[in-house]
């Protein structure tokens, strides 16, 4: 599927009513772990889409362009709510956290296996060792506080094993500043991989920043605090790989293309019919956003 060749809908047609935005959540007892981690990742992707467009809006002097951003951003926000609200009421904060760390080990492992740039692959492998330890430590907390083996949640899709000890992961900030990739010559997989992993890790960082202090006991709050600081390092580590010479509109195009790529991929693999319908709807909307980005890039930068 080439989203550039698909016939797009009108961007404004993507705005939906409240009933459509509020989804039917999955069942935590029967959900496939990969359905859950797709949801967690796409929540992060949509948060990145909304925040990127807010930053673009704040740094853009052209009100016509800002209106176009506001239109698609409203739909990104509806998408984020629909995806994030797939989480059920009876899933605890710590159970959700196990899902976040499942993403943090499964996603970079797959990206590293399919990454043609040796430097980027090394960056993925490096942080992966640290996220294994985060999963292991949260799994221990889940067993201690709720007497639930984390293996029940990940269903043996991933090994829960110690990684690089978290206590040894704290580094001076300068060490996270890696060399950026040249997107003018980079393989499309490298462009996608670096943007996907940065968005995914950013969502984990945001989750711990905002909810880590709400855990019900002091031991858990301390664990969330420490790992939240490592997530800051990981977001800096991965974000440094992105090409800083891309224009705002070039970055807009990359963001929309990434969303098309992920929604199509997840639609193809999804087993849950309810969640699959969400991926299908969002793919249609993102194809419209992509074509909007193409038109804006042509209009304002003649590219």
Q: Can you annotate each of these PLM segments?
A:
Residues 1-303:
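Non-heme di-metal
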């Amino acid at each position: 599927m080439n989203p550039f060749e698909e016939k797009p809908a009108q961007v404004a047609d993507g705005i939906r009513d409240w009933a459509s935005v509020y989804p039917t959540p999955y069942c935590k007892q029967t959900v496939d772990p990969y359905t859950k981690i797709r949801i967690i990742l796409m929540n992060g992707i949509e948060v990145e889409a909304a925040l990127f467009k807010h930053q673009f809006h704040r740094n853009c002097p052209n009100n016509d362009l800002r209106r176009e951003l506001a239109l698609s951003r409203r739909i990104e926000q509806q998408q984020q709510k629909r995806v994030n609200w797939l989480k059920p009421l009876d899933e605890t904060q710590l159970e959700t956290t196990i899902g976040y760390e499942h993403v943090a080990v499964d996603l970079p492992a797959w990206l590293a296996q399919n990454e043609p740039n040796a430097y980027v692959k090394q960056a993925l492998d490096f942080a992966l060792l640290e996220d294994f330890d985060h999963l292991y430590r949260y799994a221990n907390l889940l067993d201690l506080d709720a007497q639930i083996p984390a293996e029940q949640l990940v269903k043996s899709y991933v090994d829960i094993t110690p990684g690089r000890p978290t206590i040894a992961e704290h580094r001076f900030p300068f060490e996270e500043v890696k060399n950026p990739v040249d997107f003018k010559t980079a393989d499309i997989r490298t462009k996608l991989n670096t943007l996907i992993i940065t968005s995914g890790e950013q969502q984990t960082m945001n989750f711990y920043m905002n909810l880590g202090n709400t855990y019900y006991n002091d031991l858990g709050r301390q664990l969330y605090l420490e790992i939240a600081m490592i997530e800051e390092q990981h977001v800096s580590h991965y974000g440094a790989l992105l090409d800083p010479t891309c224009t705002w509109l070039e970055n807009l195009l990359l963001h929309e293309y990434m969303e098309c790529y992920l929604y199509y991929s997840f639609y193809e693999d999804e087993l849950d019919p309810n969640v699959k319908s969400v991926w299908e709807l969002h793919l249609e909307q993102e194809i419209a956003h992509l074509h909007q980005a193409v038109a804006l890039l042509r209009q304002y930068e003649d590219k």
